Amino acid sequence: MPDKFKRVHVIVMDSVGIGEAPDAAKFGDFDVDTFGHIAKHVGGLKMPEMGKLGLSNIREIDGIKKAEKPLAYYTKMQEASNGKDTMTGHWEIMGLYIDTPFRVFPDGFPDDLINQIEEKTGRKVIGNKPASGTEIMAELGEEHVKTGALIVYTSADSVLQIAAHEDVVPLEELYEICEFCREITLDDPYMLGRIIARPFVGEPGAFVRTPNRHDYALKPFKPTVMDALKDGGKDVIAIGKISDIFDGEGVTESIRTKSNMDGMDQFIAVLDKDFNGMSFLNLVDFDALFGHRRDPQGYADALVDFDGRLVEVMEKLTDDDLLIITADHGNDPTYSGTDHTREFVPLLVYSPRFKNGGSELELRKTFADLGATVADNFEVKMPEYGTSFLKDLK
């Protein structure tokens, strides 16, 4: 390719897998297919923009026509790392191989961990289940205020959260408790991605979180492509939970989002900025609101809504832009349980510069090929892991 792209935009549709990975059984997953099963469930998906890019050329999806002349280069990527969680997927996309998976606790944390927290703090633990923070605060907040017990909960991700009223557990104490939890969960058997302090105030029936949240994350164990870009003087604009996933490493600007649609609003606003580097967007609602909750209809509606926003995105792209759409794992809402699913993820790569459209790329054996391509484009330090496909984009 003659000239490099000035801007690369990566959109991660969180959990939008495109069919069972060859090693899915090792992860307890059988006949999983997020995109395919959602499309079947609703009698076909209406996603004309993704269709034009070449989504059904990767493999046929009910309701989405195969493009005769796809606008994008297309293929699917296979995860190499030993995990199927958000952090593993994103870290691999940016050039790391993860051998030990981060742990998730869909049934709450083991007694041994809870006992350690109770012994260290002298406080009982209540909750200990996956929950929405606002819901568990409403459910257990009054008991917490009366007894001083700690509200401990998790989510579908690798996280331990502790909610406490600021008048019951002073902030300093809450932070110390979270630091202790961070220390004891760095390795197996817990290996948690993040500990979060969730302070709140108010009266029963009217509890509200305060801005004093504090995250104790794991930093990536090696520099990622984002670090290479930042060190090379390039912009790395993280939108949504990207900055949290990388604990701020390699990020030059972080933009928070409230929802998928807000994420698309923020992303489209970033397209109007003059920058040289990468924008990196995570759309978490697919996973958090519909995948884990096993809601195929809601998931389908969210996919259709996303597709509708691509019209605005495409209008703003120039020959200096490269758009990459992918996912970080699967989360088949028609499958049993509530966990992620081990799947291939789609890869669509588009630029208005491709005057003759795109074509099929080789199957990628690791998500890290995406990061390697970004590094190659900006001529920064290449990751140890991953092979660039930049030269295949004509």
UniProtKB/Swiss-Prot annotation:
CDD domains given in the database record: PPM
Family matches, as InterPro entries: Alkaline_phosphatase_core_sf, DeoB, Metalloenzyme, Phosphopentomutase_DeoB_cap_sf
Family: Belongs to the phosphopentomutase family.
Family annotation (Pfam families): Metalloenzyme
GO MF annotations, alphabetized: magnesium ion binding; manganese ion binding; phosphopentomutase activity
Catalytic reaction(s) noted: 2-deoxy-alpha-D-ribose 1-phosphate = 2-deoxy-D-ribose 5-phosphate; alpha-D-ribose 1-phosphate = D-ribose 5-phosphate
GO BP annotations, alphabetical order: 2-deoxyribose 1-phosphate catabolic process; 5-phosphoribose 1-diphosphate biosynthetic process; metabolic compound salvage; nucleotide metabolic process
Keyword set includes Manganese: yes
Name of the protein in its database record: Phosphopentomutase
Primary role: Isomerase that catalyzes the conversion of deoxy-ribose 1-phosphate (dRib-1-P) and ribose 1-phosphate (Rib-1-P) to deoxy-ribose 5-phosphate (dRib-5-P) and ribose 5-phosphate (Rib-5-P), respectively.
Domain of life: Bacteria
Cofactor(s) for this UniProt protein: Mn(2+)
EC code(s) of this entry: 5.4.2.7
Subcellular location: Cytoplasm
Residues holding Mn(2+) 1: D14, D328, H329
Pathway of action: Carbohydrate degradation; 2-deoxy-D-ribose 1-phosphate degradation; D-glyceraldehyde 3-phosphate and acetaldehyde from 2-deoxy-alpha-D-ribose 1-phosphate: step 1/2
NCBIfam families: deoB, PRK05362.1
Binding residues annotated for Mn(2+) 2, in chain numbering: D287, H292, H340
GO CC list: cytosol
Cofactor comment: Binds 2 manganese ions.
UniProt KW keywords: Cytoplasm, Isomerase, Manganese, Metal-binding
Keyword Lipoprotein: no
